[in-house]
Each structure stands twice: as C-alpha cells, then as structure tokens.
C-alpha cells in the first residue's frame, strides 16, 4: 500500500512538475517573445525614423544640387546674354562703319566719274591737236610719221648693232685666246700622260700547222670537216699553197678567236671529225667567254673604275674583239677614260664620274649588231638595266652629239672621245666600211622569222643562214631565199654579187646503252 502510494505520489509529483515546468517555460517563452517583439518594433521604428531622416537628407541634397544647377545655368545664360549683346553691339557698329564707307565710296565714284569725263574730253582734244600737228609736220617734211619712225629706228638699230658687233668680237677674240691656250695645256698634258697601244685589226688569222699533211685531215672526207667547222663558227677556212698554215677569214673577231682556239685544239689532239669538231668548238666558246671576262676585269682595274655590274664587265671584254675604223674599241675606251679623268683633275671636275663614263661610253658597240638602235641608245639601255647612275648615263649619251651635254663631265667625255679617235693612225676608214657592210648583211638575214643564226663568209660574197626546222619547211626555204635576196638588193650596196645559202638541218640523236 505504501509502495502504491509512493508511486502515485511520484506520478502526481511528476505530473505537477511537468505542468509547472510547462507553464514556467511558456511564461519564459512568452516573455522572450514579448522582448523580441518589442526589440523588433524598436528596430522597425528606428529604421522608419532613419529612413525618413535619410530621405529628408537626400531630398535636401537634391534640392541643393538643383538649386546649384539652376544658379549655374542662370549665370551662364546671363554671361551668354551679355556676350550676345556685346556681339550685337559690335555688329551694329560695323554696319554703321560700312554704311559710312559705302557712302564715301559712292561719293568718290561720283567724283571719279566726273573726273573721267573731263579726262576723256581732254584726251579727245589732245588727239585732235596731235593729228593737226602731225599733218602740219608731214606737210612741212614731206614724209609720213610712220616713215619717220622707221628711219629713226633703223638708224638707232644700225648704230647699236655696230657697237655690239665690235664689243662681241673683242670679247670673243679674248675668250678664244684664253680658252685655246688653256685647252691646249689641258689636252697636251692629258695626252702626254696617256700612252696607249692601238693595233689595227685585220679580218684574217693564221694558224700554224705541224706539217702539210694536216691540211688534208682538216678538210676531211669530201670536205665534211671543213664544212662543219665553217658552219659552227661562221668563219671561212682558206687552205691554199701557203706551207704549214691555214688562214681563218671573217669580220667578227670573236668568231675568229673561237675558230682559232678550236682548230689549234683539234690539231694538238689529232682526232678531227665532225663530232670532235663540235666538242672543241663548244670548249673554245667557253674559253673565249673566260678570256672576255678577264679583258673586262683588266680594263676596269687599269682605269680604277670599281663596282661595275658583272654583265657590264663581260660586255667590256667583248669590246676587245670589236673595232671602230680599225681602232680596238676596248683600248679606245680605256684611253678615253684616262684622258677624261686627267682633264677632270685639271679643271676640278668629278674624276671618278669622268673615268666611269669614259670607260663605258662605247658599251653599246658590244651588242649593237644584235639589237636595234644606235650604239648610244643601246648603251643607255644597258646602263639603265644594270643600275648605273643618271650622271654616268648622261655623260656617255652625249659623246656623239645625240644629246645636249648638261654637265662638265659629259663635255670631257665627248672631248676625250674625239681626241682618242682623231689621233693620227688611230683609225682606218676602209676596214670599218667593209665590216659594217658584213654586219648589215647578217642583220638583214636575222630579221626574218625562223632564222636561227647567220654568217657572212667569203669576204661578204656569201651569206649562210641556219634556219629552225620546226619553223620553216623545205618548200618555204626557196621563198625565203628569194625574199632575202630582194631585200639585200634593196638595202645594201656591194660589189659583184652575194650568194644566199639557206641550210635546214634535222637531227635525230639517240644513245645506245
């Protein structure tokens, strides 16, 4: 019983405790909730108060900013209004000034018009008086006014011309004496310092033979060897009774040199047949190319002219195998360079420019038989192509009078060219005319389409033309020969007759392996 009571009491106590705890916790919770609500309300009230304060401050700031802007705008408007008023005032003042000036101009214009009328009236009166006076003078003197003017002008012109001619003659005489004296000194000094050998070139070369039996081997079976050599080189081989010698005849020194070297190699080798001849001619061409380059380099070194394009060096070397009226063109060019340089040093001109232009002045002659135009025009094109200066091109272009010299160096090159050419024994006219005729003959042949190369042989009595087989067939050869003959008759003067031989060759080459 006691146990049950105890349990009941415990249960009741626990229930009371739980209930009491519940109410206590509830009161505490309600108290905390009340505090939280009060705090939240305070925060909200404070936030409302703060936001109203901030809003009022922002509104106040905005009003102040607007007031500031309005004040600034009003100030700017006042300033602009003031400026506009000032500008309007200046415009009004200018208009008033212009109005006054316009009134003055109108007044002056009226005055000028009146004065002009008075002047015109006076001029009319003067003209009437002059006419009356002239009529009186003409009636008294018996001549018209135009005739009197003509007489006065004629007499005055005659007197002035006489005085001018006397003065000019005296000045010219004095200038010529001084110029002749100075030029003789300069030219004499230049010639004295320059001593160049000039060998008169011929059109034949003699090749020595070890024995006369070699002549038969050179001719070959049915003449095939000699024909092959003549066809490949364009040179005539003359084999006569001259002991142990063969004569090479041709107007082109380069071809003669190729033929000479090839023939000497064939003689030394001993094997002479068409295939070997072709091989030796090709080797000779390469050897002559090297020799030409050496000649050009030697000429540039001898004249102290540096920086020349390699192609111009090669063309300079070719001039060693060209002649002008029998004068070796390369040696002539070297001599012109030396003389022009010496004269330039004497008068204070550009020595390097004078030497360079003197050395290159005849460069066009290296290819003038291959290109159209004078050697001066060809030379100018070559120098432009290989980037020579305008001064050098101008100086070389004037040496034959085709262009007016604009520089002292151009005059010096022209003078040096004339000095070198005019030296006694330097040139021979007849050989040059003969060579030019042969060059013209080859030029006519090469002007036709389909012609590969041509050679003037037999002292110009025969022209041998090699044509391209793919361009000209057998039927067209006869027509080409007839046309070429007619053109030679029309354009060339020559003694006797010229044989036109056209060769069309087709080769088929295969190699057995």
UniProtKB/Swiss-Prot annotation:
It is an enzyme of class 3 (hydrolase). GO terms for cellular component: plasma membrane. The chain crosses the membrane at residues 3-23. SMART domains: HDc, KH. GO terms for molecular function: RNA binding; RNA endonuclease activity. Residues 203-266 form the KH domain. It is found in: Cell membrane. GO terms for biological process: mRNA catabolic process. It comes from the Bacteria. InterPro entries: HD/PDEase_dom, HD_domain, HDIG_dom, KH_dom, KH_dom_type_1, KH_dom_type_1_sf, Ribonuclease_Y, RNase_Y_N. Its EC number is 3.1.-.-. It is a single-pass membrane protein. Keywords: Cell membrane, Endonuclease, Hydrolase, Membrane, Nuclease, RNA-binding, Transmembrane, Transmembrane helix. PANTHER family: RIBONUCLEASE Y (PTHR12826:SF15). This is Ribonuclease Y. It comes from Clostridioides difficile (strain 630).
């Amino acid at each position: 019983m006691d146990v049950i009571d105890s349990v009941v009491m415990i249960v009741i106590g626990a229930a009371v405790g739980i209930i009491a705890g519940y109410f206590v916790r509830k009161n505490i919770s309600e108290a905390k909730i009340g505090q939280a609500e009060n705090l939240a309300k305070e925060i909200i009230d404070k936030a409302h108060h703060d936001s109203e304060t901030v809003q009022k401050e922002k509104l106040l700031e905005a009003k102040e900013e607007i007031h500031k802007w309005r004040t600034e705008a009003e100030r700017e408007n006042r300033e602009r209004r003031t400026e506009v008023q000032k500008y309007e005032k200046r415009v009004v003042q200018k208009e008033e000034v212009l109005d006054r000036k316009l009134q003055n101009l109108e007044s002056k214009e009226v005055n000028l018009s009146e004065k002009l009328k008075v002047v015109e009236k006076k001029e009319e009166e003067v003209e009437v008086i002059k006419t009356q006076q002239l009529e009186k003078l003409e009636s008294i003197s018996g001549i018209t006014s135009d005739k009197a003017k003509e007489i006065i002008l004629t007499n005055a012109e005659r007197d002035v011309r006489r005085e001018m001619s006397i003065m000019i003659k005296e000045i010219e005489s004095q200038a010529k004496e001084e110029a002749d004296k100075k030029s003789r000194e300069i030219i004499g000094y230049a010639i004295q310092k320059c001593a160049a050998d000039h060998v008169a070139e011929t059109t034949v070369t003699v090749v020595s033979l070890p024995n006369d039996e070699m002549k038969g081997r050179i001719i070959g079976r049915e003449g095939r060897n000699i024909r092959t050599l003549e066809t490949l080189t364009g040179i005539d081989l003359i084999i006569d009774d001259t002991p142990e010698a063969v004569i090479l005849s041709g107007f082109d020194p380069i071809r003669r040199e190729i033929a000479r070297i090839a023939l000497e190699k064939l003689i030394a080798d001993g094997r002479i047949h068409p295939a070997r001849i072709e091989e030796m001619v090709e080797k000779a061409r390469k050897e002559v190319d090297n020799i030409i380059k050496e000649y050009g380099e030697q000429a540039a070194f001898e004249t102290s002219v540096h920086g020349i394009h390699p192609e111009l060096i090669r063309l300079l070397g070719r001039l060693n195998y060209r002649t002008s009226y029998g004068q070796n063109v390369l040696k002539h060019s070297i001599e012109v360079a030396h003389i022009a340089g010496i004269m330039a040093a004497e008068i204070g001109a550009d020595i390097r420019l004078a030497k360079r232009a003197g050395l290159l002045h005849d460069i066009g002659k290296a290819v003038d038989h291959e290109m159209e135009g004078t050697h001066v025009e060809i030379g100018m094109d070559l120098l432009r192509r290989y980037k020579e200066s305008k001064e050098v091109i101008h100086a070389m272009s004037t040496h034959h009078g085709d262009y007016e010299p604009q520089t002292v160096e151009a005059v010096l090159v022209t003078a040096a060219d004339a000095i070198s050419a005019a030296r006694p024994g330097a040139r021979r006219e007849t050989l040059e005319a003969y060579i030019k005729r042969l060059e013209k003959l080859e030029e006519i042949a090469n002007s036709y389409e389909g012609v590969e190369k041509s050679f003037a042989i037999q002292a110009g009595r025969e022209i041998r033309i090699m044509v391209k087989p793919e361009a000209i067939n057998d039927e067209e050869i006869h027509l080409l020969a007839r046309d070429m003959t007619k053109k030679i008759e029309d354009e060339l003067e020559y003694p006797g007759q010229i044989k036109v031989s056209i060769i069309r060759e087709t080769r088929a080459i295969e190699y057995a392996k």
